[in-house]
Amino acid sequence: MNRRQMLGTMAGLAALPALPRASDLIGKPVAIEDDPISVPSEGWITDVDGIEVGHFTDDRRPTGCTVILCRHGAIGGADVPGGNPGSRLTDMLQPLRNADESVIVEAVVLTGGSDYGLASAGGVERYLRERYFERHKAEPHPKPHVPIVPAAVIFDLFADQDWTIVPTAESGYKACEAATKGKVAEGCVGAGAGAAIGHWGGNPTKSGLGTASLKLGDTGVVVGAICAVNAVGDIYNPNTGKLLAGSRTDDGKNFLPILERLRAGKEVVLPPPGTHTTISCVATNASFESAAMAKIAQMASAAHARVINPSWAPGDGDTVFALSTGTLKTPVEHGAIGAMAAEVLKEAILRAVVNATGRPGMPSYRDMLRGRPL
């Protein structure tokens, strides 16, 4: 570029309208988007052959658990990018732990109740042990069998509720009994019953559980995802970059982005470490070993950064499980599945938000969209 062209370019730039300074936006409420975000109305993780899902939702207070059941087993992997996770058996799903051996998972548990809720995985183990004995009832002394049931938790204990009510082993067992291959209930059910978003600002919006699936053309490959969204951060529409839901103003009528508060250096209510998180499971019918599934889980976790901001915060315990049921034997590159897993998990996160139902004092996205904060 010569000097004349450069001067012309600079003159053109000078004629453009000035961009607003960050300081001009600080502390100003953000209006609700006029048009609700469009997310697929169909598709669930159960579209992956070999995957079933069951919920237990407690009717005494908002909490529960969700079981992703693999009756014939699935090769598992995991990624834990969150700062303060509450989980079970995630270490054995790391590639460095089992470099030469794949781990066969029979179920994954997503649960509320914080660490107390991990007890629900014991009920899932009991259910699977009983099914094992049913399959081997003709044998006088079946060999010992310990089902692998990884789990992750969200923090949904609130001082204004009886927080001693948490998912138990019986809750996990009932979720297994409810498991089906069909349509999966979304919103404030199972692990998403007590979920909320935008905690960092101190005045959150109700969230829940979402699921989605994606078929890769005519290849026969299916990728699915399910998640409970209880994020510290706000949720953004990836199509527009605009705030979708999250931290609200003190009067609760509008959203006030956490990032704007932080830019202003304003005091922000910091949640205690480990009190909030997004926990997820992605699955595919393509065949892979555990090392590849751990990489797929890691790639899928990119969905958090595309939709949640801030993501992977110190107060988050973000955990992503990945399962390969292996019913499709056609060779597929695992990087391609990881890329698609991130896309489908992004949709599941959005569905968790838009399908949530508000409760007194904590409106949902739909309540805010209609101008009816509770």
Regions found by a protein language model. Give the residues of each.
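Active-site-adjacent structural elements in enzyme catalytic domains
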Residues: 122-129
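A structural signal for small-residue-enriched, beta-sheet-centric alpha/beta enzyme cores
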Residues: 24-115, 130-374
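N-terminal export signals
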Residues: 5-23
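Feature captures the catalytic cores and cofactor-binding loops of soluble hydro-lyases/lyases
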Residues: 119
